[in-house]
Amino acid sequence: MKKSILFFFLSFTVLVNSQTEAIKYNNIQTDFFFGRPIEHDKKLKDAIDGNSYGILLSFNKINTKNTNFNKLYNYPERGFSFLYQNFNSDVLGEVFGGYRHYNYNLKNTSSSSLKLISGFGFGYVTKSYNAITNPNNHALGSKLLASAYLKLQFFQLLKKEKLSINTGVSLIHFSNIALKNPNLGINTVNLNVGFNYLLEPIKFQPLQEEITTNELDKKVYFNLILRGGYNESLEIDSGIFPFYTVTFYANKTINKFSDITFGTDYFKSEFLKNHIKNKNLEEGKTYNENDYARVGIFVGHELIQNNFSFVSQIGYTVYYPFPYVSRVYERFGLKYKLGKHLFSEVTMKINLFRAEALEIGLGYKF
């Protein structure tokens, strides 16, 4: 999952060819996919019975506003998509998903339509963990889930006036972000075949002005973010507790697409206090129940999307009084500029493959 997400962010750095056509089309696409869930934890062995399959229906609307953003990203499409997936497993069942997605045109030729599609939304699974009726489902602890997908579309089998058949690969992720355990999550790698139909043509005049690097503000800025939310420990039915995170970091713009970041996190997760207490009682440990704060340092990247940015970070916990999953952590999510100084964030903190928390944050840029 992490490698696929990192590939997603790095792929955007090759978007340098500008769109010169003056006609675009809204379109709909139906993808049929077939794949295999990834057994990233041995506890998933009894849940994964075989290959999964499903259908993804997408409604795509072209963005023709003459802005620097659209010119930089080759006039991307955006829209809504709906998914049905059958895990072909009595443990995992079926899942339905709804997403807001973005399509980025990496390359367009007569025989190739290289696109990168990212979708973020929610899912509903028919079978979740139950201690009595479904004890082997360590992937999904609740029926309501967070979900995301990445799709790389790279080859056209057929292209007519309005109809085309496209192939590609995709990665689909479901989890409940540690709001209810167990929560190993489920990731599926798929092969896709998509049928695309063009709707009404849209004529527009592409922006011709070039953007030079001299226009970029490459100063180093400092940022302070307060994050919070609720989550549960690894212990099933141990209850949800609030958590708080204070982040201070520096950022610098390096090109038209990217900022790099470096900073530190202070984590205060109330569930750890209860978790440490239980471990001391059950295993005879002597950890200090009141010493459960953690401190980490991280480096990161922000992919600039107008007022939005895609955030990716990898960090290491330097103050670690109690061992919990992993010292290494990752953070992925969205950042939105509210003004010159204020911004908001919605991010997912992950310890290796295991989601720890969905973070809601408010930040200030100095």
Tell where the protein language model's regions lie, with residue ranges.
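Bacterial Sec-dependent N-terminal signal peptides
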Residues: M1-T30, L114-L116, L163, F195-L199, ...
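Short glycine/proline- and aromatic-enriched beta-strand/turn motifs that initiate or cap beta-hairpins
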Residues: Q19-T67, P206-N251, K365
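Residues that define the transmembrane beta-barrel architecture of outer-membrane proteins
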Residues: K24, D49-I55, N74, L92-G98, ...
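Transmembrane beta-barrel strands of outer-membrane/channel proteins
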Residues: I28-R36, F82-Y84, L116-Y124, T167-H173, ...
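Residues on the lipid-exposed face of transmembrane beta-strands in outer-membrane beta-barrel proteins
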Residues: T30, L57-K61, R100-Y104, S118-F122, ...
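Outer-membrane beta-barrel "beta-signal"
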Residues: P37, N187-L207, A355-F366
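Outer-membrane beta-barrel translocator domains and adjoining extracellular loop/strand segments
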Residues: H40-K45, V91-E94, S128-P135, I177-L184, ...
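Repeated loop/turn-to-beta-strand initiation elements of outer-membrane beta-barrel proteins
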Residues: N66-F69, S110-L114, L158-I165, P201-F204, ...
